[in-house]
Protein backbone atom coordinates (compact mmCIF):
# COMPACT_ATOMS: atom_id res chain seq x y z
CA UNK A 1 0.00 0.00 0.00
CA UNK A 2 1.56 3.28 -1.12
CA UNK A 3 1.30 6.69 0.55
CA UNK A 4 -1.18 7.87 -2.10
CA UNK A 5 -3.49 4.89 -1.66
CA UNK A 6 -7.10 6.09 -1.97
CA UNK A 7 -6.19 9.13 -4.09
CA UNK A 8 -7.98 9.19 -7.45
CA UNK A 9 -6.40 10.88 -10.45
CA UNK A 10 -7.82 11.72 -13.88
CA UNK A 11 -5.07 12.11 -16.48
CA UNK A 12 -5.80 13.58 -19.90
CA UNK A 13 -3.46 11.81 -22.31
CA UNK A 14 -0.50 13.88 -23.41
CA UNK A 15 3.19 13.66 -24.20
CA UNK A 16 6.30 13.01 -22.12
CA UNK A 17 6.42 14.89 -18.81
CA UNK A 18 2.69 14.75 -18.08
CA UNK A 19 2.29 10.95 -18.47
CA UNK A 20 5.45 10.53 -16.40
CA UNK A 21 3.82 12.50 -13.59
CA UNK A 22 0.76 10.25 -13.71
CA UNK A 23 3.02 7.21 -13.65
CA UNK A 24 4.82 8.44 -10.52
CA UNK A 25 1.51 9.08 -8.75
CA UNK A 26 0.39 5.56 -9.70
CA UNK A 27 3.69 4.14 -8.44
CA UNK A 28 3.00 5.75 -5.08
CA UNK A 29 -0.41 4.13 -4.86
CA UNK A 30 -2.85 6.52 -6.52
CA UNK A 31 -5.62 5.19 -8.75
CA UNK A 32 -4.95 6.85 -12.12
CA UNK A 33 -7.56 6.81 -14.88
CA UNK A 34 -6.00 7.74 -18.21
CA UNK A 35 -8.34 9.46 -20.68
CA UNK A 36 -6.92 8.35 -24.04
CA UNK A 37 -7.71 9.58 -27.51
CA UNK A 38 -10.00 7.51 -29.68
CA UNK A 39 -7.63 8.22 -32.57
CA UNK A 40 -3.84 8.50 -32.49
CA UNK A 41 -2.26 11.93 -32.07
CA UNK A 42 -0.73 12.78 -35.49
CA UNK A 43 1.75 15.17 -33.83
CA UNK A 44 3.14 12.62 -31.39
CA UNK A 45 6.73 11.65 -32.10
CA UNK A 46 6.11 8.18 -30.63
CA UNK A 47 2.91 6.19 -30.92
CA UNK A 48 2.56 4.96 -27.36
CA UNK A 49 -0.27 2.62 -28.30
CA UNK A 50 1.67 0.63 -30.90
CA UNK A 51 5.15 0.95 -29.37
CA UNK A 52 5.26 -1.44 -26.41
CA UNK A 53 8.68 -0.20 -25.33
CA UNK A 54 7.31 3.34 -24.98
CA UNK A 55 4.12 2.38 -23.13
CA UNK A 56 5.80 2.19 -19.71
CA UNK A 57 4.31 5.60 -18.89
CA UNK A 58 0.95 3.78 -18.75
CA UNK A 59 2.23 1.54 -15.98
CA UNK A 60 -0.26 1.07 -13.17
CA UNK A 61 -3.02 3.09 -14.87
CA UNK A 62 -6.55 2.28 -15.90
CA UNK A 63 -7.71 3.79 -19.18
CA UNK A 64 -10.74 4.79 -21.16
CA UNK A 65 -10.85 6.13 -24.74
CA UNK A 66 -12.95 9.28 -25.20
CA UNK A 67 -13.42 12.02 -27.77
CA UNK A 68 -12.95 15.29 -25.90
CA UNK A 69 -14.63 17.19 -28.73
CA UNK A 70 -17.82 15.25 -28.04
CA UNK A 71 -19.96 16.94 -25.35
CA UNK A 72 -21.15 13.59 -24.01
CA UNK A 73 -17.57 12.39 -23.55
CA UNK A 74 -16.62 15.68 -21.90
CA UNK A 75 -19.47 15.13 -19.46
CA UNK A 76 -18.09 11.66 -18.75
CA UNK A 77 -14.77 13.25 -17.78
CA UNK A 78 -16.52 15.76 -15.54
CA UNK A 79 -18.37 12.91 -13.81
CA UNK A 80 -14.99 11.33 -13.10
CA UNK A 81 -13.70 14.68 -11.85
CA UNK A 82 -16.53 14.84 -9.33
CA UNK A 83 -15.22 11.63 -7.75
CA UNK A 84 -11.50 12.36 -8.05
CA UNK A 85 -8.82 14.23 -6.13
CA UNK A 86 -6.53 15.25 -8.99
CA UNK A 87 -6.70 16.09 -12.70
CA UNK A 88 -3.55 16.25 -14.84
CA UNK A 89 -3.38 17.85 -18.29
CA UNK A 90 -0.53 18.86 -20.58
CA UNK A 91 -2.29 20.67 -23.41
CA UNK A 92 -1.30 24.03 -24.85
CA UNK A 93 -2.57 27.04 -22.86
CA UNK A 94 -6.31 27.53 -23.24
CA UNK A 95 -7.11 24.15 -24.81
CA UNK A 96 -8.85 22.57 -21.81
CA UNK A 97 -10.87 25.76 -21.38
CA UNK A 98 -12.06 25.44 -24.99
CA UNK A 99 -12.94 21.80 -24.38
CA UNK A 100 -15.02 22.70 -21.34
CA UNK A 101 -12.54 21.07 -18.95
CA UNK A 102 -10.71 24.11 -17.61
CA UNK A 103 -10.02 24.72 -13.91
CA UNK A 104 -13.10 26.87 -13.29
CA UNK A 105 -15.49 24.28 -14.74
CA UNK A 106 -13.80 21.42 -12.91
CA UNK A 107 -13.78 23.28 -9.58
CA UNK A 108 -17.49 23.96 -9.95
CA UNK A 109 -17.95 20.19 -10.03
CA UNK A 110 -15.37 19.47 -7.32
CA UNK A 111 -14.05 22.39 -5.20
CA UNK A 112 -11.40 20.16 -3.58
CA UNK A 113 -9.87 19.13 -6.90
CA UNK A 114 -6.14 19.62 -7.41
CA UNK A 115 -5.82 20.71 -11.04
CA UNK A 116 -2.31 20.01 -12.31
CA UNK A 117 -1.31 21.43 -15.67
CA UNK A 118 1.96 21.19 -17.56
CA UNK A 119 3.33 23.43 -20.31
CA UNK A 120 6.76 24.34 -21.56
CA UNK A 121 6.62 28.10 -21.00
CA UNK A 122 3.67 28.62 -18.66
CA UNK A 123 0.04 29.58 -19.23
CA UNK A 124 0.84 33.25 -19.87
CA UNK A 125 3.78 35.31 -21.09
CA UNK A 126 5.50 36.07 -24.40
CA UNK A 127 6.45 32.43 -25.10
CA UNK A 128 3.28 30.78 -23.78
CA UNK A 129 1.89 29.94 -27.22
CA UNK A 130 5.21 28.69 -28.60
CA UNK A 131 6.07 25.05 -29.11
CA UNK A 132 9.18 23.68 -27.44
CA UNK A 133 11.17 20.62 -26.50
CA UNK A 134 13.53 19.66 -23.70
CA UNK A 135 16.62 21.13 -25.34
CA UNK A 136 14.86 24.48 -25.88
CA UNK A 137 14.00 24.82 -22.18
CA UNK A 138 17.47 23.75 -21.07
CA UNK A 139 19.04 26.19 -23.55
CA UNK A 140 17.05 29.31 -22.76
CA UNK A 141 17.50 28.87 -19.00
CA UNK A 142 21.27 28.71 -19.39
CA UNK A 143 21.66 25.18 -18.05
CA UNK A 144 22.95 23.85 -21.37
CA UNK A 145 25.86 26.30 -21.31
CA UNK A 146 27.73 24.38 -18.64
CA UNK A 147 27.83 21.08 -20.50
CA UNK A 148 30.77 20.28 -22.72
CA UNK A 149 34.44 21.14 -23.11
CA UNK A 150 36.10 24.52 -23.74
CA UNK A 151 35.72 25.80 -27.31
CA UNK A 152 33.07 23.15 -28.07
CA UNK A 153 29.42 23.80 -28.82
CA UNK A 154 27.08 23.01 -25.90
CA UNK A 155 26.30 19.30 -25.69
CA UNK A 156 22.62 18.30 -26.04
CA UNK A 157 21.57 16.52 -22.87
CA UNK A 158 19.27 13.47 -22.67
CA UNK A 159 15.59 14.37 -22.62
CA UNK A 160 15.56 14.32 -18.84
CA UNK A 161 16.92 17.60 -17.52
CA UNK A 162 14.07 19.80 -18.73
CA UNK A 163 11.13 17.48 -19.30
CA UNK A 164 11.54 15.30 -16.22
CA UNK A 165 13.70 17.35 -13.85
CA UNK A 166 12.13 20.70 -14.69
CA UNK A 167 8.63 19.51 -15.56
CA UNK A 168 7.50 16.17 -14.18
CA UNK A 169 9.04 16.40 -10.73
CA UNK A 170 7.86 19.96 -9.92
CA UNK A 171 4.37 18.99 -11.10
CA UNK A 172 4.31 15.92 -8.83
CA UNK A 173 5.64 17.91 -5.86
CA UNK A 174 3.05 20.62 -6.48
CA UNK A 175 0.22 18.10 -6.73
CA UNK A 176 1.13 16.24 -3.55
CA UNK A 177 1.56 19.52 -1.66
CA UNK A 178 -1.82 20.76 -2.91
CA UNK A 179 -3.43 17.47 -1.88
CA UNK A 180 -2.32 18.11 1.70
CA UNK A 181 -3.73 21.64 1.51
CA UNK A 182 -7.04 20.35 0.11
CA UNK A 183 -7.33 17.78 2.89
CA UNK A 184 -6.74 20.47 5.52
CA UNK A 185 -8.91 23.22 4.04
CA UNK A 186 -11.36 21.59 1.64
CA UNK A 187 -10.09 23.87 -1.14
CA UNK A 188 -8.45 22.71 -4.34
CA UNK A 189 -5.69 24.51 -6.19
CA UNK A 190 -4.32 24.92 -9.70
CA UNK A 191 -0.73 23.75 -10.12
CA UNK A 192 0.70 25.61 -13.12
CA UNK A 193 3.95 23.77 -13.85
CA UNK A 194 6.15 25.26 -16.57
CA UNK A 195 9.17 23.22 -17.65
CA UNK A 196 11.20 26.39 -18.19
CA UNK A 197 10.51 27.60 -14.64
CA UNK A 198 11.25 24.20 -13.14
CA UNK A 199 14.55 23.99 -15.00
CA UNK A 200 15.60 27.38 -13.64
CA UNK A 201 14.64 26.24 -10.14
CA UNK A 202 16.76 23.11 -10.49
CA UNK A 203 19.76 25.30 -11.35
CA UNK A 204 19.86 26.60 -7.78
CA UNK A 205 22.95 24.56 -6.95
CA UNK A 206 24.83 25.91 -9.98
CA UNK A 207 23.96 29.52 -9.22
CA UNK A 208 24.95 29.04 -5.58
CA UNK A 209 28.32 27.61 -6.61
CA UNK A 210 28.80 30.47 -9.05
CA UNK A 211 28.09 33.00 -6.29
CA UNK A 212 30.92 31.41 -4.29
CA UNK A 213 33.33 31.99 -7.15
CA UNK A 214 33.68 28.30 -7.99
CA UNK A 215 31.83 28.38 -11.30
CA UNK A 216 33.16 30.44 -14.18
CA UNK A 217 31.47 31.46 -17.39
CA UNK A 218 34.00 29.46 -19.44
CA UNK A 219 33.02 25.83 -19.83
CA UNK A 220 35.33 23.30 -18.23
CA UNK A 221 37.19 25.94 -16.22
CA UNK A 222 35.78 25.20 -12.78
CA UNK A 223 35.76 22.50 -10.14
CA UNK A 224 32.69 20.83 -11.55
CA UNK A 225 33.19 21.23 -15.30
CA UNK A 226 33.99 18.46 -17.74
CA UNK A 227 37.28 20.18 -18.58
CA UNK A 228 38.87 19.40 -15.20
CA UNK A 229 40.74 16.12 -14.91
CA UNK A 230 39.11 15.28 -11.56
CA UNK A 231 35.61 15.59 -13.04
CA UNK A 232 35.56 13.84 -16.38
CA UNK A 233 35.12 10.58 -18.27
CA UNK A 234 37.96 8.41 -19.56
CA UNK A 235 38.05 5.59 -22.05
CA UNK A 236 39.46 2.34 -20.69
CA UNK A 237 41.43 -0.40 -22.41
CA UNK A 238 38.26 -2.38 -23.13
CA UNK A 239 36.72 0.57 -24.99
CA UNK A 240 34.22 1.35 -22.24
CA UNK A 241 34.26 4.52 -20.17
CA UNK A 242 34.72 5.31 -16.49
CA UNK A 243 33.42 8.47 -14.83
CA UNK A 244 35.49 10.28 -12.21
CA UNK A 245 34.45 13.07 -9.85
CA UNK A 246 36.97 13.46 -7.04
CA UNK A 247 36.03 16.92 -5.77
CA UNK A 248 36.86 16.66 -2.07
CA UNK A 249 40.54 16.64 -1.02
CA UNK A 250 40.40 13.17 0.54
CA UNK A 251 38.86 11.66 -2.60
CA UNK A 252 41.30 13.54 -4.82
CA UNK A 253 44.31 12.23 -2.91
CA UNK A 254 42.91 8.71 -3.20
CA UNK A 255 42.45 9.19 -6.96
CA UNK A 256 46.05 10.38 -7.33
CA UNK A 257 47.34 7.44 -5.29
CA UNK A 258 45.29 4.86 -7.20
CA UNK A 259 46.56 6.29 -10.48
CA UNK A 260 50.13 5.71 -9.28
CA UNK A 261 51.17 9.35 -9.00
CA UNK A 262 53.18 10.77 -6.11
CA UNK A 263 50.90 12.80 -3.84
CA UNK A 264 53.78 15.05 -2.74
CA UNK A 265 54.85 15.91 -6.30
CA UNK A 266 55.40 19.67 -6.71
CA UNK A 267 53.18 19.70 -9.78
CA UNK A 268 50.13 19.21 -7.55
CA UNK A 269 50.73 22.28 -5.40
CA UNK A 270 48.35 24.58 -7.26
CA UNK A 271 45.63 21.94 -7.32
CA UNK A 272 46.05 21.30 -3.60
CA UNK A 273 45.71 25.02 -2.92
CA UNK A 274 42.52 25.15 -5.00
CA UNK A 275 41.10 22.12 -3.20
CA UNK A 276 41.99 23.68 0.15
CA UNK A 277 39.97 26.75 -0.85
CA UNK A 278 37.03 24.53 -1.77
CA UNK A 279 37.27 22.70 1.56
CA UNK A 280 37.30 25.99 3.50
CA UNK A 281 34.09 27.07 1.77
Locate each region found by the language model.
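Acidic, glycine-rich segments within the central catalytic cores of soluble metabolic enzymes
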Residues: 140-281
